[in-house]
Structures are given as C-alpha cells and as structure tokens.
UniProtKB/Swiss-Prot annotation:
Sequence positions that bind Mn(2+) 2: D36, D194, D233
Major subcellular site: cytoplasm
Gene3D superfamilies registered for this protein in UniProt: PPM-type phosphatase domain
Protein name: Serine/threonine phosphatase stp
Family membership: Belongs to the PP2C family.
Organism: Listeria innocua serovar 6a (strain ATCC BAA-680 / CLIP 11262)
Upper lineage: Bacteria, Bacillati, Bacillota, Bacilli, Bacillales
C-alpha cells in the first residue's frame, strides 16, 4: 500500500484542529485516519488528537484482521471506546466542555477496503476513472439535502453547514457508519476533512485524482487548490493506492 498524508492550517484559521495519519499493527497492516476537531479554545485540537491517538494505539496492538467482517467489528467496537474516552476527558476538564471531532478511517482487507465514519469528514473512491463518495455526511445540511428541503447549490453556501448531527466526544454512545467496497490496484482512496470538500468542487477533485501526477503530487495539489479557493478551514488529505505487488496479500 502507498499512502500520502497532508494537513494544512489553511489561509484563515490561526491553528490546525485537524489530525490524522497512517499507522500499522503488529503484522504491518495499515489503518489510515482523518479527524477534524471542533470546540473553542483549541478544544478541537485535543479532540481530534485524542481520536487519532487512541484509535491508532489500539490498532498497533492488534495482529492481522483478514476479513472485512472482522475489521468492521473491530472498528465499531474500538470507535465506541474512543468516543467514551473523549467524553470522559471533556467532562473532567472545564475548558474542554463541548469539544468533539469527526472521524473517517479505512483498513484494507484482501481486495476490499473497510471505511468507518462519524461526522462530515469524507471518504471517496476513484474506480475506473470515476470518483464516488463512499461516506454520508452526518450534518444538518446533508439531512436537509436528503429530504429535498434544499438544493445541492443551496447546501454549498448554507449558513448552518457546519452543524453536525454526529461527532465523537459529544454523547456517551455514537452511531458509526461502516462500508465495505472493492479496492483494486488501479483504484485510489481519498479521505479528507471538509476544509477540502467545502472549497474545491467535486469535478475538480475528480480531475486531480484522475491525473497522471504521482500520489504525492496529487496530495500537494489538493492542499494548494483548497487554499487557492480561499483556504477558509484546515485542510487534511489522505490518499491511498494499493501496490501492484501487494494485490494478493491479506494485509496489503
């Protein structure tokens, strides 16, 4: 597997509340994670850092999970535990009250990838030169869009587009979505925070993914493009390709 991770403060924010990275378990099986924190007085930094650290630390203690079912079970269970830890920590620290974070994570399983998400950080897959969104935003605006109360154009500039219906660290239990999709050697997986998707039109995102650039160059272009559109939020991008020689390996 080849992965490229980038995070950038953007052009407006004074600090970066996004977090993420690539982490391996005892059998070198990778997990990729992106989290976007929220809350005043840098509480968002704490929430996203905790989510990534706790989930990756738990992953580092596992051995290879070979089936999608095993991975889904592990993600559901572990993300619940991470959520409880964040809630308890926020309750113990007065200035962290109200903090929370989104989370999107992915683990490879044979010729598939398992995605888990909470909030509005997204997962996309480029397959056969077509990009599609795998995750569903857990946000007020997405719910209004889903029920037909607003148009896609309205959603882009909606004044309440930052209101989440689900996040880690808010309540004692959180609903986690998981998806299992085919992931072949010619495919590219993109995990990102809304600092990318709120700035860069999806048609341009698809063109970047389809381009002949290297994976590293694509990651850089995503950050540059989001900043060129205004960089109004922190921007985090994680790109994943499966290496050709790893196609038949369980932990590739």
């Amino acid at each position: 597997m080849h992965a490229e991770f980038r995070t950038d403060r953007g052009r407006i924010r004074h600090h970066n509340e996004d977090n993420g990275g690539v982490f391996e378990n005892k059998d070198k099986q990778p997990i990729v994670i992106v989290a976007d924190g929220m809350g005043g007085h840098r509480a968002g930094d704490v929430a996203s850092e905790m989510a990534v650290r706790l989930l990756s630390d738990a992953w580092k203690e596992t051995t290879a999970l070979l089936t999608a079912e095993e991975i889904e079970t592990w993600l559901q269970k572990t993300i619940q535990e991470v959520n409880k830890e964040i809630v308890l920590y926020a309750e113990s620290e007065m200035d962290l009250n109200g903090m929370g974070t989104t989370l999107v994570a992915a683990i490879m399983a044979q010729s598939q990838v398992v995605i888990a998400n909470v909030g509005d950080s997204r997962g996309y897959l480029l397959q056969n030169d077509v990009m599609r969104q795998l995750t569903e935003d857990h946000s007020l605006v997405h719910e209004l869009l889903r029920t037909g109360e607003i148009s896609k154009e309205d959603a882009m500039n909606h004044p309440r587009k930052n209101i989440l219906l689900r996040a880690l660290g808010v309540e004692g239990k959180v609903e986690v979505d998981t998806f299992v999709v085919p992931f072949q050697t010619s495919d590219t997986l993109l995990l990102c925070s809304d600092g990318l998707t709120n700035m860069v039109p999806e048609a341009e995102m698809e063109e970047i993914l389809k381009s002949k650039r290297t994976l590293s160059e694509k990651a850089d272009v995503f950050i540059t493009k989001a900043n060129s559109y205004g960089g109004e939020d922190n921007i985090t991008v994680l790109l994943v390709e499966r290496n050709l020689m790893q196609k038949g390996r369980d932990a590739s």
